[in-house]
Amino acid sequence: LVDFIHSESRLKFPEYRAPGSDKWQQISWEEAFDRIAKHIKEDRDANFIEKNADGVTVNRWLSTGMLCASASSNETGYLTQKFTRALGMLAVDNQARV
């Protein structure tokens, strides 16, 4: 992990590549988080299942999942699991299992 943190090739700022482009451009953290939040919200709004065919509340979001890092602490894993489940995600996995 220390090698990764101190690597000369480590990205220190978010970058964006427009569709069809072969060039990456540096963007601000605010823009990166806004873009991520926008895409997550659009996908969840379009694919969230509140009730199943029988009318039972299920609150599922099946089109997006979360892959967690294997180097995370148990506490981080617990919070990640709670966060993703609160959003309705069912597909949550950990890199350590792969």
Regions found by a protein language model. Name each.
Residues L1-V98:
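N-terminal export/assembly segments and adjacent metallocofactor-ligating motifs
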